[in-house]
């Protein structure tokens, strides 16, 4: 499989699929959150600046997370490389933490209920995850392990001609499309949204479990490899922590019904 990672080129300007995924995902979230915000969780004034807060949280968190979790030694040796975002290197877990922090500050600033805001936003986030994984697939990165199944594909970036799991597509479906359906079914057809933070915990647990198991068929990052027992990757460790935190918050939420 070999698809040009550049979606559009105008003179010296190159627009990559990965950049388009971010842009479309953010614009969709902005539109969708306003559409489903029937109880006016966000104020009209807050909507004017929310995109800048999202972008700041995702970029800072995603980049810092990647540096700390996946390639710290390299960036300590070549610190200027930290700022070369166009070369890639973002972490979902880092971006999630960055968004969590910026949204907390944002909600304090505009006097918005934090967990209600997070619940609302997470109804749209899976679409961004879906688009991001499709971009990973187009770029031929984050491919899976060698397989003999009929789902196998050849990724030129792997440096060999073995058939491999298209793990990006597995993630696009289970972490993206299916999670979007689940989150919105719960939001529209159950009383879950009445309990602040409940959708947040469901998102954390779902994503963490799915990511943990898909990592078994995904090739580990070459610069990190396995970090525990020769079969646990960094992505699995972070996802496991995500699940544990989600379960803990869920228990607190059920006890208090209002975090």
UniProtKB/Swiss-Prot annotation:
Its EC number is 2.5.1.145. GO terms for cellular component: plasma membrane. The keyword Transferase applies. Pfam families: LGT. This is Phosphatidylglycerol--prolipoprotein diacylglyceryl transferase. Keywords: Cell inner membrane, Cell membrane, Membrane, Transferase, Transmembrane, Transmembrane helix. Coiled coil: none annotated. Belongs to the Lgt family. The lineage of its organism: Bacteria, Pseudomonadati, Pseudomonadota, Alphaproteobacteria, Rickettsiales. Catalyzes the transfer of the diacylglyceryl group from phosphatidylglycerol to the sulfhydryl group of the N-terminal cysteine of a prolipoprotein, the first step in the formation of mature lipoproteins. InterPro entries: Lgt (IPR001640). GO terms for biological process: lipoprotein biosynthetic process. It is found in: Cell inner membrane. It comes from Ehrlichia ruminantium (strain Gardel).
């Amino acid at each position: 499989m070999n698809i040009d990672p550049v979606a559009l080129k105008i003179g010296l300007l190159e627009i990559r699929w990965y950049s388009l995924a971010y842009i479309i995902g953010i614009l969709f979230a902005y539109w969708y959150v306003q559409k489903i915000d029937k109880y006016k969780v966000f104020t009209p004034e807050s909507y004017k600046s929310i995109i800048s807060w999202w972008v700041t949280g995702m970029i800072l968190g995603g980049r810092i997370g990647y540096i700390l979790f996946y390639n710290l030694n390299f960036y300590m040796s070549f610190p200027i490389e930290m700022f070369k975002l166009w070369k890639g290197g973002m972490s979902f877990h880092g971006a999630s933490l960055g968004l969590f922090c910026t949204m907390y500050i944002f909600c304090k600033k505009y006097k918005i209920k934090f967990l209600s805001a997070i619940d609302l936003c997470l109804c749209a986030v899976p679409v961004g995850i879906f688009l991001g994984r499709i971009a990973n697939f187009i770029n031929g990165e984050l491919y899976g392990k060698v397989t003999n199944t009929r789902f196998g594909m050849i990724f030129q970036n792997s440096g060999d001609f073995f058939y491999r799991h298209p793990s990006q597509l597995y993630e696009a479906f289970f972490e993206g499309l299916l999670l979007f359906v689940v989150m919105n079914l719960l939001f529209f057809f159950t009383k879950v949204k009445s309990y602040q933070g409940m959708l947040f915990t469901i998102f954390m647990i779902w994503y963490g479990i799915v990511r943990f198991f898909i990592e078994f068929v995904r090739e580990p990052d070459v610069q990190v490899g396995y970090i525990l027992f020769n079969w646990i990757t960094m992505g699995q460790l972070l996802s496991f922590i995500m699940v544990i935190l989600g379960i803990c918050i869920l228990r607190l939420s059920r006890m208090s019904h209002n975090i």
